């Protein structure tokens, strides 16, 4: 019995590194085929399977021929002038991408032990607002921050090398290489013949490549940076007895006391690093000297250049001093501000009053950028004056009010933790008046007539859900300085994403 268990464990370990047996699973092929049909909304799969082009049957036959060392293999047929055949070829290729992605995901789930252990706590980490409480705890104790934009352009052979670390069978690697080069050729019209864009389209395969690439970067990068900072802190050490240390310095005649800066020694003490990432944006919070920040930037450049064999543009790493400048992240302006505190301490009969200075994280909602985004979406003009949404006049009154209501609720929940709440209510006024003008334009009347017809429903039924959020989140005993982050936000606000894209273009230019 023990021998049987040992053999089963060996077979299980063998399956973790060899992915081609999963291609022969009919259930995985059916799941990928049905998933791809659901995405395209097709219910007639009769014209989809083309025997001369890519399909799961072609994949199986190709793997068998590779095992027999037959070099005359063609995974993808030549292009034909017939549009139906070309459509079937593209559909079959995309369907095979779905199947191959499922096979890779299943093999990773079988191999990774942390995958099953982390499933219970996955739901608690879905919100992107879990980043901001972490930043409120860590950033006030840092003095530098490095804003990194992860490169999303990578050669297909680099991706093959990444997957080669945990895929041991040659047929699957050859199939992956063929798929990547075929997928790369689809972007040849845009002069991307040598580069694979892993975030080019929001497909399952592209997201899988992006996550694998980012995981590979972080698995090597984060331990490297932590090891660097740990070595720096051990090199200089900490000096708890500073008085005794300065007395020793006074006894040295070669180094006069006025030429020794004890402030630099204090900054070299207890260096640490914190890392957080969302999408392609990464933040590294540092506590150390400017020299350590320059060394960290130097190592980051060389890491991507030599490990992934790609040129890392200098504008992708921006090092900032938190006490002097602010930075943008996830649609917020982040600023660390010093806040003085007066502390009274009583010892026996004496009363001492001391001043303490603490750092506080202040996330600011970009009101002007939101107004510009609303103007671009035709909710107001450039000056911020509300206008009617003419494209929504064909909808019913309830649909118009619900659409404006959802826009405001999403904005309010996303920027619920910002310190400039007054600017958000200015946005609410613009949306409310734009909603009234849209209804007036639909009924060919004025805002006053619409308000008289609808009564209080326009102002109470719509744009009122934030009151429920405030009443459930705040209480009379809570501090007014404490911010509330909504834990149901799983993605960035579209207006914030639009503003972030504009910021990225300005940085590149």
From Swiss-Prot:
It comes from the Eukaryota. Pfam families: Intron_maturas2, MatK_N. Keywords: Chloroplast, mRNA processing, Plastid, RNA-binding, tRNA processing. GO terms for biological process: mRNA processing; RNA splicing; tRNA processing. Its main location: plastid. It is found in: Plastid, Chloroplast. Belongs to the intron maturase 2 family. MatK subfamily. This is Maturase K.
């Amino acid at each position: 019995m023990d021998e049987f268990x040992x053999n089963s464990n060996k077979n299980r370990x063998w399956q973790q590194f060899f992915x081609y047996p999963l291609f022969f699973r009919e259930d995985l092929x059916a799941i990928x085929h049905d998933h791809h049909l659901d995405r395209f909304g097709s219910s007639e799969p009769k014209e989809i399977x083309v025997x001369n082009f890519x399909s799961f049957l072609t994949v199986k036959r190709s793997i068998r021929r590779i095992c027999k060392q037959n070099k005359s293999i063609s995974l993808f047929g030549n292009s034909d002038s017939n549009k139906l055949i070309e459509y079937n070829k593209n559909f079959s290729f995309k369907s095979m991408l779905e199947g191959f992605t499922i096979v890779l995901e299943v093999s990773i789930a079988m191999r990774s032990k942390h995958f099953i252990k982390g499933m219970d706590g996955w739901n608690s980490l879905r919100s992107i607002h879990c980043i901001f409480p972490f930043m409120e705890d860590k950033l006030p104790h840092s003095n530098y921050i490095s804003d990194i934009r992860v490169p999303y352009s990578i050669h297909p052979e680099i991706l093959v090398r990444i997957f080669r670390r945990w895929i041991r069978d040659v047929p699957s690697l050859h199939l992956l290489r063929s798929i990547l080069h075929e997928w790369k050729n689809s972007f040849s019209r845009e002069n991307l013949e040598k580069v694979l864009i892993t975030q080019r389209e929001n497909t399952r395969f592209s997201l899988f490549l992006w996550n694998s690439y980012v995981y590979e970067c972080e698995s090597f990068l984060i331990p490297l940076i932590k090891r660097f900072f740990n070595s720096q802190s051990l090199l200089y050490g900490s000096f708890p007895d500073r008085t005794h240390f300065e007395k020793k310095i006074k006894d040295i005649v070669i180094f006069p006391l006025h030429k020794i800066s004890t402030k630099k020694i204090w900054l070299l003490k207890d260096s640490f690093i914190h890392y957080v990432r969302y999408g392609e944006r990464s933040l590294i919070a540092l506590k150390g000297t400017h020299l350590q920040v320059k060394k960290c930037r130097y190592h980051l450049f060389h890491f991507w250049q030599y490990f992934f064999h790609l040129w890392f543009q200098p504008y992708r790493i921006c090092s900032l001093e938190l006490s002097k400048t602010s930075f943008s992240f996830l649609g917020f302006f982040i600023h660390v501000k010093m806040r003085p505190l007066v502390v009274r301490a009583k010892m026996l009969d004496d009363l001492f009053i001391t001043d303490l200075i603490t750092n506080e994280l202040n996330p600011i909602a970009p009101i002007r950028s939101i107004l510009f985004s609303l103007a671009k979406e035709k909710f107001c003009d450039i000056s911020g004056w509300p206008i009617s949404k003419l494209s929504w006049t064909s909808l019913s009154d309830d649909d118009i009010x619900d659409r404006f209501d959802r826009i405001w609720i999403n904005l309010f929940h996303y920027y619920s933790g910002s310190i400039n709440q007054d600017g958000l209510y200015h946005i609410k006024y613009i949306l409310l008046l734009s909603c009234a003008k849209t209804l007036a334009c639909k009924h060919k009347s004025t805002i006053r007539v619409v308000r008289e017809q609808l009564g209080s429903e326009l102002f109470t039924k719509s744009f009122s859900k934030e009151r429920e959020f405030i009443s459930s989140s705040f209480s009379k005993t809570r501090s007014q300085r404490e911010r509330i982050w909504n834990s149901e936000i799983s993605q960035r606000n579209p207006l914030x994403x639009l503003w972030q894209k504009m910021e990225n273009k300005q940085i590149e230019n």
